[in-house]
Amino acid sequence: MKKYESRRSKIADGVYWVGVLDWDIRMYHGYTLKGTTYNAYLVFGDEKVALIDNTYPGTSAQMWGRIKDAFEKEGREFKIDVIVQNHVEKDHSGALPEIHKKFPDAPIYCTEVAVEGLKKHYPSLKDAQFKVVHTGDTVDLGGKTLTFLEAPLLHWPDSMFTFYNEGGILFSNDAFGQHLCFPAHKRFDKDIPEYVLMDANQKFYANLITPLSKLVLKKFEEVIQLGLLEKIKMIAPSHGQIWTDPMKVIKAYQDFATGKAAKDKAVIVYDTMHYSTQKMAHAFAEGLMSEGIDVVMYFLHYDERSEIVKDILDAKAVLFGIPTIYDEPYPSIGDIIYYLRGLKFNRTGFKRLAVTFGSMGGEGGAVAKIAEDLAKCGFEVINQYELYYVPTEDELTNCYNMGKELAKRIKEMKIE
């Protein structure tokens, strides 16, 4: 190998991370502010070698460098015998045509739904040898066995997990991932600060997994019934860090899915043109904080939606400050509302409280419209407050008092 070529990272005996570090990406799914990784894994059995997932189109040079390095380390012939494709999405399958071209005799193991998806994405695979798998199916690599577990809609219809039995490693694809990009030799959860890891884990769940929360709980039940839960020693997702403490992330997912992660916390989201709605937002915050409620404030001039929904995930209440423009809500508010519609936060075990407020001219109505939208998104709207132009001291006092009242409702909420 050339000195500058990418190196593999060993994660267990005969198992290597051979993925890609994407230091520069900032807009994949709109929330990769710290970059991301496209994790791929090699499993060396005594007789066969399996490659689990791959990388985004145009990024495969790193992956090939790491794959070659792993083969050299193992002293094995450069030959991939088994290709496992846990998920169709291009950040995990983009190099599949290259891999198939280089190793045309290697069968591609995936779900039945994935076969059609892969052929649609990559017409060059139309004659590839696909092996359709179902939950419980296995492939023997010689001393190492891979077991497949279908996971439809976690998070695409084609998704599946792969479990390396003897090593206790669950290759979970997108589930349990995070959009983080740390150096190749820092692949494990324990290699980075815990608060960074868990914050990224919460953000990933909020933006990708929230609408699937009921399926998450159902899949955990299935894993328990199959007797796999106690066998999992490590979780190797397709983005970010590898979990050597799998129960930490499993519990986090359970708490997110059931609402048990919720704190006495409120998220205030607002935009403003002439700072009237901003003044109201700050007054609401003071009222909430006076009762000991944690407050997170987002100003849509500068803040983006993926950070906002991360904080909504463990909050009990949201407040939306809405300026009126031509008798309609300010456009930036509409953006986040449409995003919330898809995320369906009411599937996470409880309904979060909501308050809408804002300044208006003319006939107004934006506050009521967003209240209606929030109700459709699964929030319990308990108050609306709309006023003309610049708020007076009395009106700001009203905002403060409504914040205090909301704080009391938050404290009364019990999530079982």
UniProtKB/Swiss-Prot annotation:
PROSITE patterns: FLAVODOXIN_LIKE. It catalyses: 2 reduced coenzyme F420-(gamma-L-Glu)(n) + O2 = 2 oxidized coenzyme F420-(gamma-L-Glu)(n) + 2 H2O + 2 H(+). The keyword Iron applies. Keywords: Electron transport, Flavoprotein, FMN, Iron, Metal-binding, Oxidoreductase, Transport. Its cofactor is FMN; Fe cation. Binds 1 FMN per subunit. Binds 2 iron ions per subunit. It holds the Pfam family ODP. FMN binds at residues 272-277, 324-327, 359-364. Fe cation 2 binds at D91, H92, D174, H239. The keyword Transmembrane helix does not apply. One of its GO terms (molecular function) is metal ion binding. InterPro entries: Flavodoxin/NO_synth, Flavoprotein-like_sf, Metallo-B-lactamas, ODP_dom, PAS, RibonucZ/Hydroxyglut_hydro, Rubredoxin-O_OxRdtase. Residues 266-407 form the Flavodoxin-like domain. SMART domains: Lactamase_B, PAS. Fe cation 1 binds at H87, E89, H155, D174. It is an enzyme of class 1 (oxidoreductase). Its EC number is 1.5.3.22. Catalyzes the oxidation of F420H(2) with O(2). May be involved in O(2) detoxification, reducing the intracellular O(2) concentration to a level allowing growth at the expense of methane formation. In the N-terminal section; belongs to the zinc metallo-hydrolase group 3 family. This is Coenzyme F420H(2) oxidase. It comes from Methanocaldococcus jannaschii (strain ATCC 43067 / DSM 2661 / JAL-1 / JCM 10045 / NBRC 100440) (Methanococcus jannaschii). The gene is fprA.
